[in-house]
C-alpha cells in the first residue's frame, strides 16, 4: 500500500514538474509542430510513393489538430489552418505529379534525363527546400523552378504528337505544376509573406 502511494505521489510530482517546466503552450513546442507539419510537404516530394497519400494526409491532419489545440488561446492560432491548407494543397499536388511521372511509358522522350524531367526534379527539390526552411530566397527559387518546369513541359507537349492517353497524362502533369504555382502565389497562404514581388495592397485612407 505504501509503495503504491509513493509511486502515485512520484507520478503526480513528475506530472506537475513537467507541466511547469515544459508547458504545452510553450512557443518552442508550437514551432516544432509547425516544422513537423511543413515536413509533411517535404515527405510528399521525396518519400516512398506506396501508401504515401494516406500517410501524408493522416500525418498532416494529426499535426494540425495538435497545433490548433496548443494555439487555441494564442493570437497566432490563425496560422494553423493557413499552414494546413498550404501543406495539403502543395503536398497533394506533388504526390499527384509523382504518380503521373511514375506511370509514364518507357520512351526516350519521357526519360528522367530529358530537360523537362530534369526541370521538374529541380522544382521538386526547390519546393522541398522551401517547406523545410521557408525564406524569401527559397520562395523565389521555387517559383522560378515551377515556371521553368511549366515551360519545359509545355514545350515537350508541342514538340511531338503523343498518343491520346500520353497527351492526357502530360496535360495532367502540366495541370499539377500549375496547381503548385497557384498555391505558392495564393495571397492567403503563409508563404505569401515571402513573395517579394507580390502586389502591395493599398492601406485604408491612403491617398490615390
UniProtKB/Swiss-Prot annotation:
One of its GO terms (molecular function) is transmembrane transporter activity. InterPro entries: PHBA_efflux_AaeB/fusaric-R. Disulfide bonds: none annotated. It is found in: Cell membrane. It is a single-pass membrane protein. The chain crosses the membrane at residues 7-29. The keyword Amino-acid biosynthesis does not apply. Keywords: Cell membrane, Membrane, Transmembrane, Transmembrane helix. Pfam families: FUSC. The keyword NAD does not apply. GO terms for cellular component: plasma membrane. It comes from the Bacteria. Involved in the resistance (detoxification) of the fungal toxin fusaric acid. This is Fusaric acid resistance protein FusD.
Amino acid at each position: 500500500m505504501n509503495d503504491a502511494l509513493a509511486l502515485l505521489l512520484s507520478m503526480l510530482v513528475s506530472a506537475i514538474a513537467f507541466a511547469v517546466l515544459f508547458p504545452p503552450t510553450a512557443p518552442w513546442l508550437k514551432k516544432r509542430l509547425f516544422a513537423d507539419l511543413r515536413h509533411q510537404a517535404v515527405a510528399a516530394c521525396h518519400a516512398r510513393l506506396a501508401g504515401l497519400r494516406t500517410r501524408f494526409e493522416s500525418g498532416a491532419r494529426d499535426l494540425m489538430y495538435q497545433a490548433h489545440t496548443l494555439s487555441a488561446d494564442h493570437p497566432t492560432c490563425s496560422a494553423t489552418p493557413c499552414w494546413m491548407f498550404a501543406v495539403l494543397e502543395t503536398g497533394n499536388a506533388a504526390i499527384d505529379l509523382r504518380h503521373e511521372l511514375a506511370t509514364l511509358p518507357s520512351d526516350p522522350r519521357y526519360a528522367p534525363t530529358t530537360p523537362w524531367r530534369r526541370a521538374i526534379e529541380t522544382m521538386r527539390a526547390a519546393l522541398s527546400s522551401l517547406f523545410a526552411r521557408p525564406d524569401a530566397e527559397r520562395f523565389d527559387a521555387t517559383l522560378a523552378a515551377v515556371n521553368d518546369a511549366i515551360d519545359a513541359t509545355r514545350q515537350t507537349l508541342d514538340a511531338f504528337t503523343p498518343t491520346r492517353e500520353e497527351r492526357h497524362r502530360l496535360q495532367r502533369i502540366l495541370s499539377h505544376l500549375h496547381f503548385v504555382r497557384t498555391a505558392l502565389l495564393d495571397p492567403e497562404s503563409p508563404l505569401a509573406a515571402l513573395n517579394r514581388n507580390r502586389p502591395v495592397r493599398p492601406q485604408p485612407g491612403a491617398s490615390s
